[in-house]
């Protein structure tokens, strides 16, 4: 499992240096089992996030992998998809062990594995402190293919021989920095000693302090290193407005009026559902507006083509769903319209935020019905920002 990795000496400021740059930007081209791919899409994923594009393939190929990424980047699904791809559902023994620093995170990971593996006939058991030891023993004797747990309870179950390690192929450490800082180092080292020599190790961590690097040096063989830098999104420099719309049905006319008032160089309009995107595209096209639409029902080829046209400026208005907000590089977009306010406030910054280093100016206009007022207030509070009523001279601001 281990030989000292020379490359780790280059580390500065707790950041690893990537040594692997291949990316795969669609789930369809990862050669996943059909029933796993079905689970990925059923879970709501449309397109792999940055870490998923880079880390899933090396893990599936069997490399030891160190991935440095913040939470919220899609790392749970990264190792869940990889684990599910590699295990044999017909073998009723633990083939993958996932460690997490807290019970809550372990349970959350279990839910993701179960949901994505929904069509695969795979069992995943959460082995965590604070629950009945007897229940754990019983569940482990049934031979779940994936066990996710906290170091203390997992170590206990391996020592008592209820969690058998002889069929284990993969060992995943999630939030390794957290686990080590919580004093689990000894138990983690003990677990390593009890695993087969050939076990593949995958380690995920937001930071890379010395104790995490020691684990990688001791227990990982020539690891692939992937650093996903945190994209700092900011609302600075973006003027945010709302237009009060009395009822949902009036939004379309409001949008048409806005078109008349404003010369739009490029705009993205966000709706909350794919159906709404298609509906709005049809309505605007019928009113002789040129728009393109993009959502997850389209295949990757179509989406790439639409993005290319949009980036080159040959299409000026793009109507899209949230799931693509993170994938759209809207640096050149002067206007973002939230036809629907996002269903969760985190997506607001992905729709209208900009990479701070670009410092581009922009305008965001939110269509707000009476039902949306509460959500808008929540967004303002969450981001400590102000969304003001749109002034008459909005055209001068864009």
UniProtKB/Swiss-Prot annotation:
Where in the cell?
Cytoplasm
The UniProt GO MF terms for this protein read: ATP binding; ATP hydrolysis activity; RNA binding; RNA helicase activity; translation initiation factor activity
List where the motif Q motif lies.
25-53
Q: What family name appears in the similarity comment?
A: Belongs to the DEAD box helicase family. eIF4A subfamily.
Enzyme Commission code(s) on record: 3.6.4.13
Q: Where is this motif: DEAD box?
A: 174-177
Give the protein's function.
Answer: ATP-dependent RNA helicase which is a subunit of the eIF4F complex involved in cap recognition and is required for mRNA binding to ribosome. In the current model of translation initiation, eIF4A unwinds RNA secondary structures in the 5'-UTR of mRNAs which is necessary to allow efficient binding of the small ribosomal subunit, and subsequent scanning for the initiator codon.
Name of the featured protein = ATP-dependent RNA helicase eIF4A
The UniProt entry, under InterPro entries, shows:
DEAD/DEAH_box_helicase_dom, EIF4A_DEADc, Helicase_ATP-bd, Helicase_C-like, P-loop_NTPase, RNA-helicase_DEAD-box_CS, RNA_helicase_DEAD_Q_motif
């Amino acid at each position: 499992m281990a030989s000292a990795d020379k490359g780790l000496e280059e580390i500065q400021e707790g950041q690893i240096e990537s040594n692997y740059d291949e990316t795969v930007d669609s789930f369809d081209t990862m050669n996943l089992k059909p029933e796993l791919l079905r689970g990925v899409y059923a879970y709501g994923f449309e397109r792999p996030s940055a870490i998923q594009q880079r880390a899933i393939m090396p893990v599936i190929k069997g490399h030891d992998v160190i991935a440095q990424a913040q939470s919220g980047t899609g790392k749970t699904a990264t190792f869940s998809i990889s684990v599910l791809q590699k295990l044999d559902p017909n073998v009723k023994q633990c083939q993958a062990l996932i460690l997490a620093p807290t019970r809550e995170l372990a349970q959350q990971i279990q839910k993701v594995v179960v949901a994505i593996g929904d069509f695969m006939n795979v069992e995943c058991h959460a082995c965590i402190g604070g629950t009945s030891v007897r229940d754990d023993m019983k569940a482990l004797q049934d031979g779940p293919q994936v066990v996710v747990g906290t170091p203390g309870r997992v170590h206990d179950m391996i020592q008592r021989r209820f969690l058998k390690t002889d069929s284990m192929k993969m060992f995943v450490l999630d939030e390794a920095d957290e686990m080590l800082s919580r004093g689990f180092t000894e138990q983690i080292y003990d677990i390593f000693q009890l695993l087969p020599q050939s076990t593949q190790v995958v380690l995920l961590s937001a930071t890379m302090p010395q104790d995490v690097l020691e684990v990688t040096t001791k227990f990982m063989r020539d690891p692939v290193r992937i650093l996903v830098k945190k994209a700092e999104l900011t609302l600075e420099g973006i003027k945010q407005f709302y237009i009060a719309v009395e009822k949902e049905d009036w939004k379309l006319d409001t949008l048409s009026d806005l078109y008349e008032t404003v010369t739009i160089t490029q705009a993205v309009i966000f709706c909350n559902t794919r159906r709404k995107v298609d509906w709005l595209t049809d309505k605007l096209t019928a009113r002789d507006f040129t728009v393109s639409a993009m959502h997850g029902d389209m295949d990757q080829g179509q989406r790439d083509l639409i993005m290319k046209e949009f980036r080159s400026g040959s299409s000026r208005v793009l109507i899209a769903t949230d799931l693509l907000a993170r994938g759209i590089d809207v640096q050149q977009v002067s206007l973002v319209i939230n036809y629907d306010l996002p269903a969760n406030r985190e997506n607001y910054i992905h729709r209208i935020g900009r990479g701070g280093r670009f410092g581009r100016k922009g305008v965001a206009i939110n269509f707000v019905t009476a039902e949306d007022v509460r959500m808008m207030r929540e967004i303002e509070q969450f981001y400590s920002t102000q969304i003001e009523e749109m002034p008459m001279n909005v055209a001068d601001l864009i």
